[in-house]
């Protein structure tokens, strides 16, 4: 039984069965991760552990698809730096790039993002 010490009017100083009440502190995963799942998730989380990459991913998610040439200004980073960060996110499976002329257009790999959300319990 998962126990949460919730504060406030509802349960001041009471112990609440989280599973029964559906309240705070849910576990991140329903079952232990296998070795391959843990390694894959660690790669993704490592890629997201950088604030620039996290911002970059949020920009791509909000735009649905964006040219790498349009990432420099909002990130405040040079083209080589943007390329480095998009490569890391691409290698982690979060971004998919398509070369169009001299630029790469980026979009989020929705299936991979869904896998990550599921692994984290979301």
Q: Language-model segments: what does each one mean?
A:
Residues 53, 84-85:
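Histidine-centered divalent metal-coordination motifs
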Residues 2-3, 76, 81-82:
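Intrinsic low-complexity/disordered segments
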Residues 72-73, 84, 90-91:
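Alpha-helical residues within the helix-turn-helix
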Residues 35-78, 100, 104-112:
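N-terminal helix-turn-helix DNA-binding core of bacterial DNA-binding proteins
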Residues 1-48, 92-94, 114-115, 119-120:
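N-terminal leader segment of winged-helix/HTH proteins
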Residues 65, 88, 93-94:
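Short hinge/loop at the helix->beta-strand junction immediately C-terminal to the helix-turn-helix recognition helix
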């Amino acid at each position: 039984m998962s126990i949460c010490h919730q504060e406030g009017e509802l349960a001041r100083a009471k112990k609440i069965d989280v599973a029964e009440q559906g309240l705070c502190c849910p576990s991140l995963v329903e079952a232990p991760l296998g070795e391959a799942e843990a390694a894959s998730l660690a790669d993704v989380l490592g890629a997201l552990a950088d604030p620039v990459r996290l911002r970059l991913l949020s920009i791509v998610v909000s735009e649905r698809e964006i040219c790498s040439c349009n990432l420099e200004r909002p990130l405040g980073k040079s083209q080589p730096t943007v390329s480095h960060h998009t490569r890391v996110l691409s290698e982690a499976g979060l971004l998919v790039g398509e070369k169009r002329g001299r630029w790469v257009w980026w979009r989020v790999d929705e299936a991979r993002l869904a896998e990550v959300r599921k692994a984290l319990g979301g």
